[in-house]
């Protein structure tokens, strides 16, 4: 199935719509860069990136697989949605919602599993909520 673009109206999106898209793309780009960096770091240093004791009882022998998950789910996915949004693809509207909800879910699981730093986790949960809310506004506007 081919991706569809937003219909051309001649004047482009209204200023409010452009600001909304810029906000979504900026937040998703921030999340993507940090997910790619964090995931790459965990994969490159699977036994030293974080204390191994945090993996006790999880079934993980190292931080490699959590790093892969972080890289793909928190790094690649938001990046793909941000690129889709900049290209005007309609799929980005659903993507924003998935990224926002996914980031909130990721942080909730992370907070239950391994609390490293509350301020950072609260910040990323807030970013996830912001992406979700802005994504809902974008979807209703479209």
Regions found by a protein language model. Give the residues of each.
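Topology signature of small-to-medium multi-pass alpha-helical membrane proteins
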Residues: 2-142
């Amino acid at each position: 199935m081919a991706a569809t673009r937003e219909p051309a109206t001649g004047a482009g999106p209204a200023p409010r719509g452009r600001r909304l898209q810029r906000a979504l793309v900026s937040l998703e780009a921030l999340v993507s860069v940090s997910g790619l960096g964090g995931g790459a770091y965990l994969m490159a240093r699977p036994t030293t990136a974080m204390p191994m004791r945090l993996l006790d009882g999880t079934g993980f022998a190292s931080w490699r697989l959590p790093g892969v998950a972080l890289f793909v789910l928190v790094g690649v996915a938001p990046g793909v949605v941000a690129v889709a949004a900049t290209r005007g693809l309609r799929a980005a509207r659903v993507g924003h919602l998935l990224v926002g909800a996914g980031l909130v879910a990721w942080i909730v699981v992370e907070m239950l599993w391994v609390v490293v730093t509350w301020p950072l986790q609260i910040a990323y949960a807030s970013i996830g909520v912001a992406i979700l809310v802005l994504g809902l506004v974008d979807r209703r506007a479209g």
